[in-house]
Structures are given as structure tokens and as C-alpha cells.
């Protein structure tokens, strides 16, 4: 990688002129609530009073776990800094407080915080903030609502320390954007195909088409075609996590099941680490809208659900490691050790396996060549933008495929659903079937399978076969969404746990019919959701015999915590 010099920054992000004399309190009240005198006094018990002078810098971009400041007198501002240029994001006055979600996640600061005038502040360290959030329900609501609203605003306006330059036709660009979006990190995106500034920057640095996307992180470091792991390292996503500490619980996977386990375990005082190979959300994170999840009458997107669950788990003290895969379970003795792809072993007394399952890939030789270039495994707003007003195909007959078809039909020219079976009744919720059947923009093709793909740099034509007649159809279609079947990623568990014929993890009474890799060492029998290894549990889609629904996964993740307490008492 290389570094952007201050003289070169004019190519990267032309700063918008902002009124630096912006008055505090002009933001919507949901973003900048004014604390009552009583609330301030309760905060004061955990905070340190600090006198500041005008212009004093309170923290800088890249500082570890910045504190929250409550303004008693004077004022403060939050500033985006880049290459000698500054942009005031917002400011806070008397009775207001700074901070957003990174204050509870423990990640590095993105912005500068600076006093606008001399005055008095209450400085609240991150650990004390978590104490207040855990003990005071009213203040917990005030802080969390403000932090969530601010992070959403930052994402929507692209206020952050990351700039992605790439092409809508680049699979690597889509992967980088999806990683940052699903992680919830604010970033700005410039498309080479529509933004001349982006092309000028790439020409300036001599970047070839094979090296896109270019990701500029921390407003200085330039990465060429980076992996999610490299982006996470550059931004310090996992830098505050102690990988040698013995944990009460390690959760593998940050989908609905894993996040539910993390929320309930952390809320009950357990030391929890979640390890996610990409970004949080799991398979549910690829869904644009889940309409049959309890409590969301108008539906909720998978990413929204995941973002709320992440904030909820972190507020109780859970830590989430992203862009790290688990390569091996070392199960010869306790505490067990979870070996990461960076070579580190994390010791833990209990483990919850919540890796989920991935969509089955049609057995076509050139499928991977079109991944991100016409073949997609998610249907979010990001993918929908790529195929506006065009014909698309959705493969699958489950809820995820149905949700994708309904969502894409709103902006695409039309949707063809390829379904292997002759009906949807056994695999899809009734409300979705009705939506699809009544939608004139969705065409159901029962008994059909994808048979061929063709194109050059991007998918151009698609063929499918109607199985009963053998008839093959070919059309010019540039976008296919694969959402059929489910396969677990459990090869790293071989030698430790019992798996079924498809690779899903066996648990509870299902273990009675198999011989485990290692003899069961305890007098008691395995508990519900417990695998063939004491203290190792499996929840969600990775479990053999599970119901592949978000609500079921969340239920299992919640229930397993009580069983973990019993296991920890045995250690």
C-alpha cells in the first residue's frame, strides 16, 4: 500500500464547505438530546470533570476507545479530518453529549473531537459508559438511541474515514462495499463509470483496472484490491481484542443465532467473544426485508436486524471479531482452543457453533467466473442498484428466494424464479407465496434448473432446462441471484464432533444413533443443542435438523445460554 500526501488529497475528497460557526442543538433531537439535570448528576458519579480551552483537541482519529463528553459549559465539535482539510460533522452544546456506536464497540475513533470554546466537560470513559448502560435503563435508552441514530446518519451521508473507488462491474468492488456496509462502517463510494474524480485519482496513482477497487482508509493509507481482512486490519477493527484471554464463551458466526447467543450470554455476565469470517448478519443479512419476524409489523431488513443485535450485544460487553475465519477446533483438553486463520489460538470454556449455512452453488464450470459480475448471493439495495430496469433470475424456492424476488420486482424490469420442485408450499411461507403469485412482474418457472451461463467480462446470457420436458430456454439476462439449498461449512470440525451425512452438526438426542469421534467423557448425557463434545453447542442453520428460519435461529441462540451456565458450573 502507499500513503496519500496532503498535497494529493485534493484528488481524493473535495471537502464541502461547512458553516464552522454552526450552533449547537440544531440537529434533530433524536441525534442530540439534551440531558436533564437529574440525568447529568447520575452521569457525574461515573465521570471526571475536565476544564478545556477553546481549540483544545479531546481525541483524534485513530485513538483507542475515545470517551464520551457531556458539555456542562462551552461547546465541542466533531470534525472529519483529511489531508489538511476539515469538515465539521456536528457540534454539541450545554447538556448534550458526544459519541456514537464505536464508544461501546471499543474500536478506534473515526473523527476529531475539539472544544469550540473554553468550558467544563464531564469525561466518561468507555468502561464507565458500559457500566451506566448496564445499570441505568433510562440513560441506557438515551445513549443507545442517540448512538444508533448518529451511526445511521453518518452512513447515509458518507461521513467516515474510508473512501472506496471502483466499478459497479467489478466483483472485488462489490465485495469491499458489502463488507463495509454489513459491518456498519461509514464510507464514501466513487464509481469510475460515472465520477471523473475517481478516474483522475486512479490515473494519478497509476492504478490499473486489475487493481480496483482502491480503498483509502484512515484518510491516508491506499490499499489496492484489498481483501476484507486487509480492510479490517487497516481500520483496526479487531485491534482492541485480546486473543490470549481465556473466554467463558466463544461464538463462531455472527448471524441471528450467534448474535442472539452473544446478547443473552453477555447480558448474564459471561465474557463473550464472537468470531465472524466476514461481516455480521449471516445469511439473513443478505435479505432486503423479513416480514414475518416477531415485533416488526412493517418488516425489517437483515442488515438492520444484525446492526441492532450487534449494538445490543456490545452494550452488554460482548466483543465481535470480524474478517477472521476459524480454521480448527483443538479439542484434546479443556479449555478448548479455537484456532484462527492468523495462527492465534483463543482458549475458551464453552463454544457455540453458529456458522450457519451457505447457498448451494449450481454445478456449472464457469459459475465462479461470474461471481459479482452477474452472479450474486445477496439481494440488498446494493445489488438492486446494479440491475435497475433489467430482467433478473432468482434461483430457489425458500423464504430467502421469495423475499429477494419480491424486493427485486420493485426496481427490476422483471423477475423469473427458477424452482426445482413443482410447488412452493413445502418450502416457503404462505404470505410470500401469495405475494409472488399476485405480482405480475414475477414469473414462476417450476421444475426448472439453471443449465448454462455465458458472457465475457460480465454475465450476458442464461440458459435453463425444464426437467419434465427437457426443453432448454436461453435469454439475454445479466443478473442471477442464487438462493437455493443450504450447505454447512464444517470441515474444520472433523475429528472433534459428530456430523450428519451432509456435514451438519449433530446434537442432543440425535447423537444416540452415531459413534462420536471421541468417547463421551461425562456421566450425564449430552444436553439439547450440545454436540458430541461437552461444552460445545450448535445453534441455527449449522445444526442437523434445524428449521431454516430467522426466528428459529434466534430462539436456539437464546435458549442455549441457560445450558452454557450448567456446563460452566462443571468446569
Which residues does each PLM region occupy?
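Cytosolic regulatory regions built on CNB/CRP/Popeye-like sensor folds
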Residues: 3-178
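Conserved beta-strand termini and adjacent loop/short-helix elements that scaffold enzyme active sites
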Residues: 54-55, 124, 167, 190-192, ...
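Short aromatic/basic micro-patch
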Residues: 68, 91, 123, 225, ...
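A generic structural motif
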Residues: 79-81, 114-116, 216-218, 339-341, ...
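Beta1-alpha1 glycine-rich phosphate/pyrophosphate-binding loop at the start
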Residues: 159, 164, 168-195, 205, ...
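FAD-binding core/adjacent interface of flavoenzyme oxidoreductases
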Residues: 194-252, 267-268, 285-286, 320-390, ...
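Rossmann-like dinucleotide/flavin-binding elements
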Residues: 243-280, 363, 369-371, 377-430, ...
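A Rossmann-like FAD-binding core segment of flavoenzymes
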Residues: 306-348, 353-355, 409-523, 566-570
